[in-house]
Amino acid sequence: MESNNGEVFMGIDKNEWGFRVGHLPHGERNKISDVPGVTVGHCTLADGDIQTGVTALLPHPGDVFHDKVLAACHVINGFGKTTGLVQIDELGTLETPILFTNTLSVGTVETALVKYMLERNPDICETTGSVNPVVCECNDSGLNDIRGLHVTEAHVAAGRGMRCHGLKGGIGSASRLVELDGKSYTIGALVLSNHATFDDLIVAGTPIHELLEARIPPHEDKG
């Protein structure tokens, strides 16, 4: 598999794909980190049947608890186990980094995030209220020994064991530059992809699965 900023993927030149996603220009790296202050970190566990990890997204380099950022959430999959969404929906703010991991490691990662916030904010639950940790998840049991609970509090890449459309899934990112009322803005996105079947792989109306059928056999989707 080869990728060079989208020029070549699975041995297919970008011109063969026959599509372009959107019309807006992207940022310098075409990643969410093009948004000023936003950073992303990964810790990958890759050892035999252990194929998992944790990804952390920090909205800015300062104290997120005291310098909260505006936030919103929208749930389209009633099977998710993300923590912290109720308060985001109620207050419209984010006060911790956002962490991503596998489904059965949400509790461990949430505890690690709480400890991280308490260490940096001794006023939490003393002179202020509690903290709202946000941990997102996907089921990586198709490629990972998820029952082994291998993620510990010391592990701070969630996408290692994910599959998407029967292919290798995981963490992906992009950015777009927009002009609004004479001002320039950078919009970033980070996804943890783990869904769908090979035959459903259609991008911008182009049946990508047909281009790949001769190269990669489809796999059963475990959800």
Describe the residue ranges of each PLM region.
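A structural signal for small-residue-enriched, beta-sheet-centric alpha/beta enzyme cores
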Residues: 6-223
